[in-house]
Amino acid sequence: MGRKKSCHVHNAPSDDDIMFSQDHKPKRIYQLWPGNNRFYCGGRLVFGPDASSLLLTTAMIGGPALTFCIRMVFLIGKRYPLFHSLILLGALLLTVLDFTFLFLTSSRDPGIIPRNKEAPEAEGLDMITQSSEWVNNKLGNTKIPRTKDILVNGYTVKVKFCDTCLLYRPPRASHCSICNNCVQRFDHHCPWVGQCIALRNYPYFICFISTSTLLCLYVFVFSWVSMLEVHGKMLLMVITNDLVFVVLILYCFVVVWFVGGLTVFHLYLICTNQTTYENFRYRYDKKENPYGKGLFKNLYELFFARIPPPMINFRDWAPEEPDEEVGSIASELDRTFGPRGDKYDMEMEIGGCKNSKVGLQLHTLEYDNNNSSEETVKKKGVSEETAAFYIPGIQEPANITRNSSIDVRSR
């Protein structure tokens, strides 16, 4: 007897299937992050939205430093080669350090706080005193207090609710309107580095502005020394014969007042354990500072304490978002059949109610194109009240209000 040959027909994927698979490729968190940050090297480098300002900062530092180094190279061949070689080496070292601290400040996660998808419920909040000012969350179903009071080192500190990130900001945290993130121990957003200055990059920022001040003073002093050494001590002859050193001296004299003043101001903030935001807003120099620990402990906390790891790993794979229809059905079932706090995930089959009849019924329910919705219900043994949430044609149960958020569509 001849054997029948079984032939399998393999259909080539259509363009719609290809586009669907491309759209549903897994993505990393940095690719879906709702903030305004710029990510490079696969999410390893986190810049602010105004990172282009780094070009101006680099030019303002590198231009004078490079000019000074080139001038020193010409002086090495004329007289005192060892002396000018040491000056050149010191200038190169300070310039490299300055750019290193600039890069570490601008490309580092400053301490971004993860966002919530839903606002906390007002009745579940543990607070000392409740604010009289209330705010609607994004769902518009409940109201929560805009502020709450917590204890920090024996002091009562008021923390605010962030309408964008849907969370109560931790103490000393604030929402940066430029980066659109809540940031830990927020100091300020620096336009010169194009990044928020906060918990995880503040030590590098201090090193950056301190090194910039030292570089300005270094170029200023040794430009004078080299100029007087080469051209003598007559000021008029010096100015007319070496305009390069004159321009460097004037430039560094102007810049050092700004960057040097900024360095002194932040050294004061470090000694008193304040941030720029707190200094301008709360004026802790005129009242008790709940974060002050004394001079030496404040210095130790900044320069020697371990920098905490980031709260978000932007290179992690982003969790797949459930379908909106499935999510609305699950939430409605949870509110109707399950006790408060019990949750069931229809896709992952996990939750606090693993043996729930609703979960088992949803798991075993299948749609049959050849049978009607009523036949499917009878076949699978699903009650009409349960089936009304996800099967068209079944009458809506009486205990569900008409303004339900469920969106049931015909399959």
From Swiss-Prot:
One of its GO terms (molecular function) is protein-cysteine S-palmitoyltransferase activity. The lineage of its organism: Eukaryota, Viridiplantae, Streptophyta, Embryophyta, Tracheophyta. It holds the Pfam family DHHC. It is found in: Cytoplasmic vesicle membrane. PANTHER family: PROTEIN S-ACYLTRANSFERASE 2-RELATED, ZINC FINGER DHHC DOMAIN CONTAINING PROTEIN. The keyword Membrane applies. It is a multi-pass membrane protein. This is Probable protein S-acyltransferase 2. The DHHC domain is required for palmitoyltransferase activity. Palmitoyl acyltransferase. It is an enzyme of class 2 (transferase). Expressed in flowers and pollen. It comes from Arabidopsis thaliana (Mouse-ear cress). The modification Phosphoserine is found at S405. The chain crosses the membrane at residues 56-76, 85-105, 205-225, 245-265. The active site is at C190. Coiled coil: none annotated. GO terms for cellular component: cytoplasmic vesicle membrane. PROSITE patterns: DHHC. Its EC number is 2.3.1.225. Belongs to the DHHC palmitoyltransferase family.
